[in-house]
Amino acid sequence: MKQKVVSIGDINVANDLPFVLFGGMNVLESRDLAMRICEHYVTVTQKLGIPYVFKASFDKANRSSIHSYRGPGLEEGMKIFQELKQTFGVKIITDVHTAEQAQPVADVVDVIQLPAFLARQTDLVEAMAKTGAVINVKKPQFISPGQIGNIVDKFKEGGNEQVILCDRGTNFGYDNLVVDMLGFGVMKKVSGNAPVIFDVTHALQCRDPFGAASSGRRAQVTELARAGMATGLAGLFIEAHPDPENAKCDGPSALPLAKLEAFLTQIKAIDDLVKSFPELDTEH
């Protein structure tokens, strides 16, 4: 079955092409740390031959606590992104939270991301669609995989069909997430075989029901990522940090930066193997 290709500059993203890595840090903690992390990702992905897009947030507008670190904000965040692009020649993905942010962010980065908690907000979707930028839609934890088709339709009606879909787990009772890997195929089917990527970092989140910050299951990142990529996906979304215990956001789910090369070596081997197989239609 023909898979849709979405192009991020010279990077082609599709379910039957070699996987693209969307990776970086959860939130821009500082200019220097962003440079350090980006450089490490670039070095490793170039060595392994993996197409790469740098990820970070300039504003975590949906933190649980009013006291939690949010990021440097729009103006300073765009300055850091511009320097990263000039220094390393990377493509960049970041999330927007208001309609007013969409165009200024799209003027700097290559992919703008629709956050899971905001994915049904029509005004935001329409503003993002109008930019003409490549879009990454985070599937909300609270909807079924089939419902993502309605979000894709909103972007199409807004004149933008350059949409990538991202699964980051589904609510399983209170304060827990599970990954329904059968849902990957459903997301492909209802979207006309749009590229589907897997956010393994945020799928590892779990919460203290009375706490102000998410916990995580970093010890299981490799097994979950391997399982997801074995289904045949367009990309993997992962965050890493040189000191996860002291990260300002989602450290318990972040891959230790020093483990990135070993981790990606395994993921690439699985992706290469799965995509070497001929397509097998078991429905008919």
UniProtKB/Swiss-Prot annotation:
Record-listed E.C. numbers: 2.5.1.55
Any GO BP: keto-3-deoxy-D-manno-octulosonic acid biosynthetic process
An annotated GO cellular component: cytoplasm
InterPro entries xref list: Aldolase_TIM, DAHP1/KDSA, KDO8P_synthase
Domain of life: Bacteria
Record-level Gene Ontology MF annotations: 3-deoxy-8-phosphooctulonate synthase activity
KW Cell inner membrane (keyword) present: no
Catalytic activity line of the entry: D-arabinose 5-phosphate + phosphoenolpyruvate + H2O = 3-deoxy-alpha-D-manno-2-octulosonate-8-phosphate + phosphate
Pathway the protein takes part in: Carbohydrate biosynthesis; 3-deoxy-D-manno-octulosonate biosynthesis; 3-deoxy-D-manno-octulosonate from D-ribulose 5-phosphate: step 2/3; Bacterial outer membrane biogenesis; lipopolysaccharide biosynthesis
Keyword terms: Cytoplasm, Lipopolysaccharide biosynthesis, Transferase
Localization (cell): Cytoplasm
Keyword Cytoplasm on entry: yes
Family, as annotated: Belongs to the KdsA family.
Name this protein carries in UniProt: 2-dehydro-3-deoxyphosphooctonate aldolase
Lineage, top ranks: Bacteria, Pseudomonadati, Pseudomonadota, Gammaproteobacteria, Enterobacterales
Chain's gene name: kdsA
